[in-house]
């Protein structure tokens, strides 16, 4: 071979050995096929479970990843068990997650097939799970004789000294049907199934009413209410008068009962001692609060008008 110099062209044979080339091609082909198979499986899972978003499923604990519980959910397409993720914030404090144990879960979302990890995002703390559990246990709900109007749930209370609790408001259009009794069942048989599934969570089933005073009074169950005053209907603010011996029950441990009642009804609820209530002073306080809120809004409300726009006459 002639000696090469700077600027010369050199031709080299870089053809791989036949065996090496065949092995590399086989590995690449296998990887491509495996990826396509995984993509197709995830697409099938997505198509199957999207229709079940907002409903309950049964999952079996497979393993733990970081602070999430990975569950196996049955697939109706003959696929292997589909994995679902139960994040820490969706877990119940009273649950004991052990490998092989089964739980009812609420399917919140089916993730896109292109994403990594479990495609199903499930919850044990969603109010939707309570609705689904009652729907499964109460035939009158399935038959649309009883309807669930509202649910307020505190599955993970801010304090460990307070347990999970749910308030559920029910109603019926049938005069001969007791919606509360239908949900509770004979000797509490129906509601007990739901309570057991939620590991002893306290559940209050109350009667919904179109009358705000009655609805608020029912929502504060089991406390005995003397009077409900709608002191600011536009602002949905109410004063609830109770006997002194009912104050702690109406408010609840660390305010949980009144907090859930407010969320259930959509009203701001102030619990007052009936014996010490001064209606004139109370209304003056409400009016003062209303004026303060109005001044705050007028002072700090941003001006959304576009400086470049022209008002039409």
What residues fall within each predicted segment?
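RNA-contacting regions in translation and RNA-metabolism proteins
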Residues: 1-313
């Amino acid at each position: 071979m002639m000696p090469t110099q700077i600027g010369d062209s050199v031709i080299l044979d870089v053809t791989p050995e036949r065996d090496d080339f065949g092995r590399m091609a086989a590995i690449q082909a296998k990887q491509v096929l495996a990826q396509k198979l995984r993509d197709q499986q995830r697409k099938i899972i997505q198509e199957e479970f999207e229709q079940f978003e907002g409903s309950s499923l049964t999952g079996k604990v497979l393993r733990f990843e970081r602070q999430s519980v990975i569950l196996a959910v049955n697939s109706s397409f003959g696929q292997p068990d589909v994995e679902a993720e139960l994040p820490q914030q969706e877990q119940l404090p009273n649950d004991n997650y052990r490998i092989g144990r089964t739980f009812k879960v609420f399917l919140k979302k089916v993730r896109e097939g292109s994403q990594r990890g479990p495609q199903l995002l499930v919850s044990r703390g969603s109010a939707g799970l309570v609705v689904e559990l009652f729907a499964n246990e109460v035939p009158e709900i399935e038959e649309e004789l009883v309807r669930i109007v509202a649910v307020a749930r505190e599955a993970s209370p801010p304090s460990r000294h307070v347990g999970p609790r749910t308030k559920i408001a029910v109603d019926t259009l049938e005069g001969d049907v007791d919606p509360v009794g239908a949900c509770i069942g004979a000797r509490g048989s129906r509601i007990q199934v739901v309570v057991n599934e939620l590991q002893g969570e306290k559940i209050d089933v109350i009667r919904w009413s179109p009358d705000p005073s009655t609805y608020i009074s029912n929502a504060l169950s089991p406390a005995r209410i003397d009077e409900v005053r709608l002191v600011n209907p536009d602002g949905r603010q109410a004063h609830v008068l109770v006997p002194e011996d009912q104050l702690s029950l109406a408010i609840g441990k660390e305010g949980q009962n009144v907090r859930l009642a407010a969320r259930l009804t959509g009203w701001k609820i102030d619990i007052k001692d009936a014996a010490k209530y001064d209606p004139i002073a109370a209304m003056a306080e409400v009016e003062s609060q209303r004026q303060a809120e109005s001044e705050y809004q007028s002072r700090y409300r941003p001006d959304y008008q576009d400086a470049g726009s022209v008002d039409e006459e």
